[in-house]
């Protein structure tokens, strides 16, 4: 009886630490096979590098920071992550939602993850220049929250992709499968130091 209990407990002891990817359609792999989305490629990279981490992708297409803030507690309880990648905000910007609300939501999510002893990476976004001053304030909000909450920061998820129309699906919003390795490389720059 005791041996059976020990055998059952062992996998929990050796389980990989978890990375929770908490984003919108840009991380959910909208319009492409799931295995091609950057969080799936992240899982493969971790395996190749023999890093003891698993990946839980809790991204939902269309999600705003308000929606993310509402569902983060349950996602944290379920995933028990060592690292949380917050990749939300693009839909707030595209809808022209108040920047203060987005900042407050990002800060609350970072704080909630930190209270669960998770390291946090905030992934920034940019808007097209035709959004005017709002676009500048929007982009600056990500860095401001990262500084305030002392999290890691990736400046722009679509860095190197946004200016290349051939790397977008027909809607001109969502990256193709071919763009996903570039998204992963961008995220990796901020994520890798958190895995040590």
Explain the meaning of each model-derived region.
Residues 4, 9-11:
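N-terminal signal peptide c-region/cleavage motif recognized by signal peptidases
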Residues 12-61, 71-80:
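Serine-esterase "nucleophile elbow" of acetyl-processing enzymes
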Residues 28, 64, 129:
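Flexible, glycine-rich phosphate/dinucleotide-binding loops
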Residues 31, 56-65, 93-97, 172:
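Acidic/histidine-rich helix-loop elements
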């Amino acid at each position: 009886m005791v041996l059976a209990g020990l055998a059952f407990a062992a996998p929990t002891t050796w389980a990989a630490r978890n990375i929770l990817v908490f984003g919108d359609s840009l991380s959910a792999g909208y319009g492409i096979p799931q295995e091609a989305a950057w969080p799936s490629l992240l899982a493969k990279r971790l395996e190749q590098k023999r890093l003891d981490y698993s990946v839980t992708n809790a991204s939902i297409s269309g999600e705003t920071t308000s929606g993310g803030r509402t569902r983060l507690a349950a996602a944290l309880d379920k995933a028990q992550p060592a690292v949380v990648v917050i990749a939300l905000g693009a839909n707030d910007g595209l809808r022209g939602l108040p920047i203060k609300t987005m900042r407050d939501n990002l800060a609350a999510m970072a704080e909630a993850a930190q209270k669960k002893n998770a390291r946090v990476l905030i992934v920034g976004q940019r808007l097209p220049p035709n959004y005017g001053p709002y676009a500048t304030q929007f982009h600056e909000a990500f860095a401001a929250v990262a500084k305030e909450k002392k999290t890691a920061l990736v400046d722009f998820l679509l860095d190197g992709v946004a200016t290349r129309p051939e790397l977008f699906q027909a809607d001109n919003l969502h990256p193709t499968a071919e763009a996903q390795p570039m998204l992963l490389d961008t995220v990796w720059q901020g994520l890798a130091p958190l895995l040590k």
